[in-house]
Amino acid sequence: MLGGLGKLAAEGLAHRTEKATEGAIHAVEEVVKEVVGHAKETGEKAIAEAIKKAQESGDKKMKEITETVTNTVTNAITHAAESLDKLGQ
């Protein structure tokens, strides 16, 4: 009789252990999903910020280059006009 009770108790303990393990696995899966979601979101924000800074830097460089080219062309035209004016005098 006690052997049957021991076997029944062992089966009950095994069943409770299995259910507890399944619950723990489910909880860990949820935590992992949440952590991965936060990591993905953080990574996406970091990439977006890096792209934004690169674009701003590129825009600034393009503005500087445009100003330099404009000034160079303006100076060349002014110099040419002054030279032509001197030739005409």
From Swiss-Prot:
Coiled coil: none
InterPro entries per record: FAM25 (IPR023243)
Source taxon at top rank: Eukaryota
Taxonomic source organism: Homo sapiens (Human)
Protein name as annotated: Protein FAM25A
Protein family per UniProt: Belongs to the FAM25 family.
